[in-house]
Amino acid sequence: MLFNNNEEINQALQGIATQDNGDLVINNADKLRGDILDKLVLNAATNPSAEIKGLSRFIIKSAALELGIVNSSIQGLYETRGRGEIKGFTVPALNIRGLPYELCRAIFRTAIKTDAGAFIFELAKSEIGYTFQKPQELSTVILAAAIKEGYKGSVFIQGDHFQVNAKNYAQDKEKEIAGLKTLIEDGIAGGFYNIDIDTSTLVDLSKPNVVEQQRANFEVGAELTKYIRELEPAGITISVGGEIGEVGKENSNEKELRAYLDNFNEILEKEKPGAEGISKISIQTGTSHGGVPLPDGTVAEVNLDFDTLENLSKISRESYGLAGAVQHGASTLPQNLFHKFPELETAAIHLATDVQTITYSRSL
């Protein structure tokens, strides 16, 4: 059901919730989790009226806060890990490409059932484009799913692979960076308080030394991180991720890691003294997005370099205070290897293909 005006929304909320001087007061949380919430989600995503769409989103986000559901940055957890105060876990980041409300409900149900720790919902720059899900819409739907399933606590929503297009950058670098800054603005305004900046596409292995190979990567990465720090809401330190090896390309190594982080930190401190840097670093260890399809429809097994993953995670924590290294393309690995990630202190793994496959093949 699409609402025709704001009054219809207020009537539907009678006895359930009321607006009071810009705040939302919940009178009956159980009824809020009923059909009215589903209607609000539908209108928040699809109502042709910007006013009705906006009010529906406001009600959902306000209700989430009232019910103890907080859209958050994972920065504090990553900082604690970087100090060595906690260990032995890996944070999964799940790409929400389709059926977002139903899928996120299933994720929250599973999290409650298993008493899960931290987990992240995310959407990449490319996925925002082809799924037509803007940050403001997706964050609303995720919070609504949390309300529906009775979840309480922090909710982490991430912009994944906010990536520089190398070809476009070569043709007009100012235009390409401006486009990414607009995406960052939209992401932060939409509640993406975790953003992975991917400038690894600018790494040029034809250069004579590792610093020059990584130069465009750390220079543009520092510029975009500075921009995030200038936009982040008061009281929130957005968790920013960096990347040194493009997924599907050459495996990363210690020299690349140190060249990127040393120069990134130096530039950021010079441009914005005291600014928080990145909290984690994505590396390449042998995976590719979506895997390598074989003629029979299966996906080729991946030879993952676990030694590199462990070593670079350790260096990033002990030398730079990061949470550790991040493994992209983890869906391409057999499930019997997943125990290796927390054992090796991997900060996070990104899961997109598996989540999409579940959406296609199973009941939510």
Please place each PLM-identified region on the residue numbering:
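Generic detector of well-ordered alpha-helical packing
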Residues: H161-V164, I197-T199, I244, G329
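Helix N-cap and loop-to-helix transition residues
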Residues: S49, P100, T131-K134, N209, ...
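Short beta-strand segments
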Residues: E122, Q158, D198, G241-E243, ...
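Alpha/beta catalytic barrel-like cores
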Residues: M1-G159, N165-N168, D172-E176, T182-L183, ...
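Short amphipathic alpha-helical segments, especially helix-boundary/capping motifs
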Residues: T80-E85, D115-I120, L202, G235-I238, ...
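Active-site capping/gating regions of soluble enzymes
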Residues: M1-A44, G54-S73, L180-K181, I188, ...
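Glycine-rich, proline-tolerant flexible connector loops at the mouths of alpha/beta enzymes
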Residues: P92-N95, F119-P135, V164-K167, I197-R215, ...
